[in-house]
Amino acid sequence: METVSSSAIGLVIAIVVVVASIWIYKAATGVMPGAKLVLAPPAGVQPSGVEENVAKFMFFYTTWCPHSRKAEGPWKSFQQVLKNTPRKYGGMTLQFEDVNAESQTGKASLYGISHYPTFKIQTKDSVYEFVGVPSVNNFRTALIGTFGQETF
């Protein structure tokens, strides 16, 4: 008969604790850990710089990051979709901004950017972070979930 080592039991207990913690967090907040929604702007960010009913959608990237280069395609495609067929999300008009974190280090620092690519959405009152695989559909889904119905 085989005996189970105490380290194997410890590993199983650790996994159970981590999984339980994730589900408790999700039940308490409504989102999975890692899905960020920043309800207050980071220190130093002045949300009043954005007009009422405008959402500034920012793409923070670096030229050396392969993930940034991969995200650029869906980002540009989404911009083109809105250029071809203008639409609003919950009454919010989108403005796009590309931020090269290498040359615009102050802006990247102001928004607390530590990894690339990062997508932030700033309104008059709040700053949100898009977390997910960059794609036209995922951008649309996130904007609908954050602001409301997509209207043409």
Description of each model-found segment:
Residues 44-84:
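Local sequence-structure signature of Cys/Sec-based thiol-disulfide redox active-site neighborhoods
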Residues 60, 79, 84-106, 133:
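Thiol-based oxidoreductase modules, predominantly thioredoxin-like and allied folds used
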Residues 109-114:
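A short glycine-leucine-enriched loop at secondary-structure breakpoints
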Residues 115-152:
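Non-catalytic, surface beta->alpha helical segment in thiol-disulfide oxidoreductase systems
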Residues 27-49, 54:
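Ser/Thr/Pro/Gly-rich low-complexity linker/stalk segments immediately outside membranes or between
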Residues 56-59, 95-98, 118-120, 129:
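Beta-strand cores of modular interaction/reader domains in eukaryotic scaffold and signaling proteins
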Residues 72-79, 105, 136, 140:
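Extracytoplasmic/secreted envelope proteins and their assembly/folding machinery
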Residues 1-30, 75:
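Single-pass alpha-helical membrane anchors
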